[in-house]
Amino acid sequence: MTYSELYSRYTRVWIPDPDEVWRSAELTKDYKDGDESLQLRLEDDTILDYPIDVQNNQVPFLRNPDILVGENDLTALSHLHEPAVLHNLKVRFLESNHIYTYCGIVLVAINPYEQLPIYGQDVIYAYSGQNMGDMDPHIFAVAEEAYKQMARDEKNQSIIVSGESGAGKTVSAKYAMRYFATVGGSASDTNIEEKVLASSPIMEAIGNAKTTRNDNSSRFGKYIEIGFDKKYHIIGANMRTYLLEKSRVVFQADDERNYHIFYQLCAAASLPEFKELALTCAEDFFYTAHGGNTTIEGVDDAEDFEKTRQALTLLGVRESHQISIFKIIASILHLGSVEIQAERDGDSCSISPQDEHLSNFCRLLGIEHSQMEHWLCHRKLVTTSETYVKTMSLQQVVNARNALAKHIYAQLFSWIVEHINKALQTSLKQHSFIGVLDIYGFETFEINSFEQFCINYANEKLQQQFNSHVFKLEQEEYMKEQIPWTLIDFYDNQPCIDLIEAKLGILDLLDEECKVPKGTDQNWAQKLYERHSNSQHFQKPRMSNTAFIVIHFADKVEYLSDGFLEKNRDTVYEEQINILKASKFPLVADLFRDDEDSVPATNTAKSRSSSKINVRSSRPLMKAPNKEHKKSVGYQFRTSLNLLMETLNATTPHYVRCIKPNDEKLPFHFDPKRAVQQLRACGVLETIRISAAGYPSRWTYHDFFNRYRVLMKKRELANTTDKKNICKSVLESLIKDPDKFQFGRTKIFFRAGQVAYLEKLRADKFREATIMIQKTVRGWLQRVKYRRLRAATLTLQRFCRGYLARRLTEHLRRTRAAIVFQKQYRMLKARRAYCRVRRAAVIIQSYTRGHVCTQKLPPVLTEHKATIIQKYARGWMARRHFQRQRDAAIVIQCAFRRLKARQALKALKIEARSAEHLKRLNVGMENKVVQLQRKIDDQNKEFKTLSEQLSAVTSTHAMEVEKLKKELARYQQNQEADPSLQLQEEVQSLRTELQKAHSERRVLEDAHNRENGELRKRVADLEHENALLKDEKEHLNHQILRQSKAESSQSSVEENLLIKKELEEERSRYQNLVKEYSQLEQRYENLRDEQQTPGHRKNPSNQSSLESDSNYPSISTSEIGDTEDALQQVEEIGIEKAAMDMTVFLKLQKRVRELEQERKKLQVQLEKEQQDSKKVQVEQQNNGLDVDQDADIAYNSLKRQELESENKKLKNDLNERWKAVADQAMQDNSTHSSPDSYSLLLNQLKLANEELEVRKEEVLILRTQIMNADQRRLSGKNMEPNINARTSWPNSEKHVDQEDAIEAYHGVCQTNSQTEDWGYLNEDGELGLAYQGLKQVARLLEAQLQAQNLKHEEEVEHLKAQVEAMKEEMDKQQQTFCQTLLLSPEAQVEFGVQQEISRLTNENLDFKELVEKLEKNEKKLKKQLKIYMKKVQDLEAAQALAQSDRRHHELTRQVTVQRKEKDFQGMLEYHKEDEALLIRNLVTDLKPQMLSGTVPCLPAYILYMCIRHADYTNDDLKVHSLLSSTINGIKKVLKKHNEDFEMTSFWLSNTCRLLHCLKQYSGDEGFMTQNTAKQNEHCLKNFDLTEYRQVLSDLSIQIYQQLIKIAEGLLQPMIVSAMLENESIQGLSGVRPTGYRKRSSSMVDGENSYCLEAIIRQMNFFHTVLCDQGLDPEIILQVFKQLFYMINAVTLNNLLLRKDACSWSTGMQLRYNISQLEEWLRGKNLQQSGAVQTMEPLIQAAQLLQLKKKTQEDAEAICSLCTSLSTQQIVKILNLYTPLNGFEERVTVSFIRTIQAQLQERSDPQQLLLDSKHMFPVLFPFNPSALTMDSIHIPACLNLEFLNEV
């Protein structure tokens, strides 16, 4: 392609920028051949003419299409160059917050300087087993790739982590080791993975320090080999260290610190155990205060020191050794603070003997003070003939002291590393290993010394190895695809390496100069200039004669030669070392022991003897100092580095390059300049260059065809089956240069930039099609607009014409209406005048006629009143006469009747004294007495009434007589006067009175009318106001009721949810304990299997521990408590079974019981909360009395049954004795002839029998009377309205009735015993008996009446108290109502709600008390019923025994009785020795296929029938042994078939059925509600197997968890492929370019690809097996709920970790797949299982991928819809969202920030991924069987002939 084709208008390019390194621009016009510049538009819309040089290829870099921006693999970019790489990393880091990016085989990790939630266990499990290219870049993906290649290729692996200080190397290496520790955890309980992780805090403490660039910088390199066995479990580890920066011990730059351990020890100096160290704060010591800053922000040195100590303890370092280590570290601090004083001559110096620090140094190391004081200031010179002791200058002494301190620390460092390696070693054979190399990256500072030189030398070696490995992989890919390839020219840094390590190279010359006695750094620098001045990688600075420049692969570095010789020699004087060797502390002496045969700290030959690579020590053996053969530091480092490279070359390397984004340690801040420097230094750009030199872009033929089919012509698409030839023909027509692409076996290979060119052609094609579509659409829109305008114009015309017509019509109507109005008005005016004249005439006539009538009225009125007066006077006189006569007659009648009554009473009293009357009235006498008494009372009352009436009449009569006399006298006086004058006066007075009355009447009428109107108006107002108040009151009441109902329902719902949640959590914790126990049990068995040897015998301690623990509790009613029984039990069970009885299980069992009790309490509480309070109130009001009545009736019936049973027993005994006496009499008559004694005894017995019958009748009579009285009292109580009084009476009544009945019974008995005293009254004594009975009855009735009166008085008082209480309550309510009226409406509602809540609370408390009382009464009655039932059974047994004895006495000869064959009772009998055979045939060797066509869960039924027979025979040991053997047998079967779904489901269903049988037939009433009478006969009689039910429940939980694990293992490989990758809807998924990861070794050819139908088929298999095995439907629902949760978790986790899966088409595919799974659930009737709810997060994620993501409304819709997704998950999906084509926009950063702002109030968990290992707690609901035990038949295929049916 020409430049004119590439650089056309709208093409975007990169140009250099001094601030941002690279800047984006866009061409404003096409480039033409010959142009010397490009016209560019920058991002700020400025126009720039950019000069170019086409001849020298100096043109700006092309920018990749937007669809490629943000790729997780840099090699997937079409244009591979520095600005593209930098921009892609910046976009991923800043916009998507992705810190990991692939660059071919390299993982680029950018330090975020912030804690991210992407390293948890859930993330580890998500990456485990996944291909490296399938998931988002992560350190876990690299670790998984290494682990997978180690297992697949059986080759050792290495992970090389590099980067400059502060880039995150140590953290990355730590997470890689954590991944291996989690995924490859040790199979045995050795905690080796914990020890590997525990080494990190130790090495950080002694090898890390604060620098200017990093607060936790590793100042040494380390290579950790993690060893694996053949099963790829971690068995051990080994560590090798490189180039510890010893100079930091004695010197630190400004704002830097020494190693962390020094400051940690100073922070803990106040602890009691460290008092002898004599330490103070770090500022007081020279070695720790040199940098100026002794603290790190956010770091607690004391806390870190405690972690270091814990890690040392975990790795087996004894406490004494730890103290010794801390003493050595403290001694180094004291040594650095020793004051050295120079003498006057300047050639010598001295140390004060009283120097405190030197004394502490010698004391802590256990050496001689004087010797160390001397040899610190002197040195020994040895010649061939003599030995000299020479003084040293101050500078020499300081250097010697510093060298000694560095040497001590280095030796201690090596000793600690050696000890860590010993702790991580194992005796098992190592099969392979994975090495993690955490080594310093390329470094360059203003002043670079020996350390930087060694570091950069190591990076040169690693870069060489890296380049060769990348080149090798690139060539392998070409050879695999069978395409021609040429040698790629890549940078080879071997010349630079030769400059450093070759003969007479820099290191060789340095060693030679060190051997010269007078060698100096300046001489060495001159030799370098002379020797290597012509080398292309060596330069001499212009302004310096002591520095030199080495051109490394990353950059030029200038080294200052000062200090090279001293650091390379690392001189320590022999005399000082000898003093340390003589230390009295073993550890100090051991550090400096000169033993050539000892294993150095980093020697790994023995620990890796089985490894494929024999790696020698990285640190050569230390020889005596100052010897000629002592190796220099440079030589040691070169040797160890060569060994490291040999190890790495023998392994498969994996690279992690850590990038430091900024120097200020700001979170998610990207500095392009610093990033580019590190990209150049770490080899990322070299990887890009190698990839760009070949064919970096690779497409499969299928993907290329789908992506670029728009560029193909119609004739080329005729045959779509041969896609390979179609792609070839298209490419040859589109790209003319055949060198730009190659056709491989399965892929098409493109040169750099070709994919971008194809994308440009594709975009141009779409642009042309878009223009055509726009043209057509615009024309159509214009036509539609014209038609709409024309139609609108016609409509306007039509409406205007219609409007004019309607206006004319309206005018005509108005004119006609005006005429009509005028006519009507004129008529109305004339009518009004006529009506006025007529009304005046009528008024005049009415007044005239009224005046005439007024004149005629007075005479008529006077005559009428006189007539009325006469009428009333005559009537009064007649009535008075009649009343006098009637009163006289009544008095006479009363006197006569009183006389007759007295005579009758006297006769009755005489008659009552006679005996005949008593005899006649012996029955019902008390009723007659009561009737007579009532009659007398009535007569007395009547007499009293009549007497009062008589006196009243007499007094009235006397008053009337006096009044009449007065009137008569007045009348006579009036008659004597003049009658005419009197009449005139009367008439005149009457007239005046009449006028006055008229006037008063008028006034009163007017006032009455006014008041009446006012009152009516006021009444109407009040009625209206009252109606309003009533309506408002009703409305408020309804509102209060609604609010109270809503609040109560809401509170009850919340409480129910809370209780359910607590119950689920408790159940989950319990089942996790069961799971942990099974894991501990498995570990115990594994350890036991490992430790067992052919000659092994248990020691006494083991034997006792095994025999003392018991896994299963005793089941008998009397527990086995002594040691002999326990030993016997162990012997019977067997050693293997007894070995399972562990102390851990007993503790867990105890915990299980406690949790079960808490669960029951919570369940009861939940059931109580779910009851409706109103229903409880109604039921208690309706049934409160019935309960007590039933209790009383039941009590009386039980008493009666007890008396009847005792009576029957006495009667039977009497009959038996009677017959026995008769038999004896017959024998006596045969021998003796004197029957008198027999007849006398017989008569006495007859008399006693008759007396017994009489007593029986009397008891019946009394019982009838008592029951009648009880009924009367109950009926009287039922008439009472109050509920509380009703519920409080029965208990007292029952007590009184019981006492009365007992007293009556004893009284009758006493009466019967005294009947002979009354025998003189008549011949048979019946009269006396009757009289005594009546007397007792009368006493009884009198007592009952007294009790009733007392009770009635109490009830009256109680009712009065209740009435008072009700009055007070009414007053309170009235006051409350008045107060409520004064409040505002809102306050009224709130006040009403509070009052209603308080009332409901009080009522609930009352009801709870009543319920508790009734429950106690019920329990008491149940206990009494059980006692009486037991007595009845005993009586029946005694009667049966007596009858059998009687039959035995009656039989006089032997009779042979034919027995029927007994029916099968549902029990199976077996002998003790057949138990092992039973378990083997029924459990161990049983196959589920053998029971096809039989009853489901047949083994469970058979086992229960065997248990039932053992219970029937009361054999405790047999039941215990059988259940223990069954449980152990099931465990063995499950362990053997731990991957067989069918076998596991078979035993899950049988274990649950056996558990249900033990519940159903346990005899507990709660489990017997659905049993038939026949099934109740099959209940256990002797044993309580409650604790065994708990053991079986735990076993069921374990089996369920194993079943879920098997099912998940079968489903998990299908989920990602079927749910995310397979195209369920064809044609939706687009195709994107793939990166290097998709073609790396992580991809395996021929990987299985699953579709959704595979998951559905697997689900159908699970469902069919579970149903065929007879598993409970409730458990089946829980199984599929768990499986659907796992599908949801795995799919969502992969979606959150895969950028290629977050697209619109994936959302469509997910919705379709989920709908298919929901349809399957409905088809299997599993929609109630809650499985759909578990898929809710995935459903919302699919909807999120399909929603619009632009505006504020879209953000609100997303927040309201995605309620099941956490904030982190929503943001992660939006960050990962990737458009599939160039026409769909990316999600902007501002939109994501808007989502975060709206979701910040959510309290979501800080967990990104779902826990795919989470398991819902399983619940086994009780499911009784309808089968009876006697209907079960055993098939012959089970070989159980030794079982006998009983």
Curated annotation (Swiss-Prot):
Its main location: cytoplasm. GO terms for cellular component: actin cytoskeleton; apical cortex; brush border; cytoplasm; dendritic spine; glutamatergic synapse; membrane; myosin complex. ATP binds at residues 163-170. Residues 915-1272, 1334-1450 form a coiled coil. Residues 21-40 are annotated as: Requires for interaction with LIMA1. Residues 599-629, 1088-1122 are annotated as: Disordered. Residues 1524-1801 form the Dilute domain. Residues 767-788, 789-813, 814-837, 838-861, 862-884, 885-914 form the IQ domain. Residues 1100-1120 have a biased composition (Polar residues). It holds the Pfam family IQ. One of its GO terms (biological process) is protein transmembrane transport. It is found in: Cytoplasm. Residues 607-619 have a biased composition (Low complexity). SUPFAM superfamilies: P-loop containing nucleoside triphosphate hydrolases. GO terms for molecular function: actin filament binding; ATP binding; ATP hydrolysis activity; calmodulin binding; ionotropic glutamate receptor binding; microfilament motor activity; small GTPase binding. Residues 8-60 form the Myosin N-terminal SH3-like domain. Component of the CART complex, at least composed of ACTN4, HGS/HRS, MYO5B and TRIM3. Interacts with RAB11FIP2. Interacts with RAB11A and RAB8A. Found in a complex with CFTR and RAB11A. Interacts with NPC1L1. Interacts with LIMA1. May be involved in vesicular trafficking via its association with the CART complex. The CART complex is necessary for efficient transferrin receptor recycling but not for EGFR degradation. Required in a complex with RAB11A and RAB11FIP2 for the transport of NPC1L1 to the plasma membrane. Together with RAB11A participates in CFTR trafficking to the plasma membrane and TF (transferrin) recycling in nonpolarized cells. Together with RAB11A and RAB8A participates in epithelial cell polarization. Together with RAB25 regulates transcytosis. Belongs to the TRAFAC class myosin-kinesin ATPase superfamily. Myosin family. This is Unconventional myosin-Vb. It comes from Rattus norvegicus.
